[in-house]
Curated annotation (Swiss-Prot):
HAMAP family: Glu_tRNA_synth_type1
Entries under PROSITE patterns matching the protein: AA_TRNA_LIGASE_I
Protein name from the UniProt record: Glutamate--tRNA ligase
Motif ('KMSKS' region) on chain: 237-241
Classification of source organism: Bacteria, Pseudomonadati, Pseudomonadota, Gammaproteobacteria, Enterobacterales
Gene (UniProt): gltX
Localization in the cell: Cytoplasm
GO molecular function, one term: tRNA binding
Amino acid sequence: MKIKTRFAPSPTGYLHVGGARTALYSWLFSRHLGGEFVLRIEDTDLERSTQEAIDAIMDGMNWLNLDWDEGPYFQTKRFDRYNAVIDQMLDAGTAYRCYCSKERLEALREAQMANGEKPRYDGHCRDSQCTHGADEPSVVRFRNPQEGSVIFDDKIRGPIEFSNQELDDLIIRRTDGSPTYNFCVVIDDWDMEITHVIRGEDHINNTPRQINILKALGAPVPEYAHVSMILGDDGKKLSKRHGAVGVMQYRDDGYLPEALLNYLVRLGWSHGDQEIFSIEEMTQLFTLDAVSKSASAFNTEKLQWLNHHYINSLPPEQVAVHLSWHVEQLGIDTRNGPELVEIVKLLGERCKTLKEMAESCRYFYEEFDAFDVDAAKKHLRPIARQPLEAVKVKLAAITEWTTENVHNAIQGTADELGVGMGKVGMPLRVAVTGVGQSPGMDVTVHAIGQARTLARIDKALAFISEREAQQ
């Protein structure tokens, strides 16, 4: 049997982390077993579905590199197929027209609730012999079995059973002729030959209804696996406050797709005590029986830790491709400065996100208007004039601009003045970067370049003189 899974988001908002995890699990399951992965856009909610949301879903999937073998399919383009099946069901007697008014249904609901009963359709039109006009508005309901139960073996949760008496006759076509969500899903899974449905636990109650429709159609029933929800670190339902933002927001905030994928796969799935997984390892190791039934808590600090790991473990060239987007967003012109690959090597250990890295690398490419106040107050004092002037002479004398020669110039200055490296390095750091923290001065000065370094030392010396004159 060819394994076939699907990811079927509704385009009513962004692709959030819960949806991304579901997509990842479905993708990994199919890839692990050499199957196929289908992308389906469930856009039957015409009022809430937007092209912007569709674009956000596609962007998120592409950024995460979760490729699909079929699709994207759109339910709104399959209405003729759904309605053809509904008409066949009407002819076969597995569906019927319901003419109950909204007023009758509301009164029924209120009466049931007043009696402490679960609100459900009472089957008034199920076996009715009364006639109605051809143009009289009606919905179409599925004739759900009234006896027995629906039992399915959830691949994450184990056997789940629903009594058919608890299931009312589901509306499968509205009065306006449009098919409903639960019905469209069934026909899609049937037509697309989906073998395994992996989705959120909020769909568990839909499953027995969908199974009954499939059985009424004589269609194969796929396997089902329902993943638990993601909670905030305070145990409450995930919200924007915890990190329930669109996947592309994580891109904007400077996270690598490899880090987010690694984080998402561990939100409910485990393999021993291993924390770091490449996408190849995930694909090789992923199984549904290792997915937890318990809810998972979102932890931003853990995601940042993983992101820092991948910034420093992936090939710098690969990280630089992602960094370039952030640098462009800040309007930094990198043509007159080091390659971004060098920035990744220089700043990787110091940065948890690429956004932080992009913001920190400005001084390699742009002149700064002012020195950091605290750093200048501490290190650009009159006592710093001598080491800055001395190191400038040695840096200016370098004919081959290498990291080693830069280091020797700084070290030689400290040796000649009989002071520690910090007495030279810290004023030099503030002079050439404008801030009090940076990578080692030899690699930083080398990356900034000789001419720019000498000009900035002159700027710092002028700053010291101005400051001295004001005192």
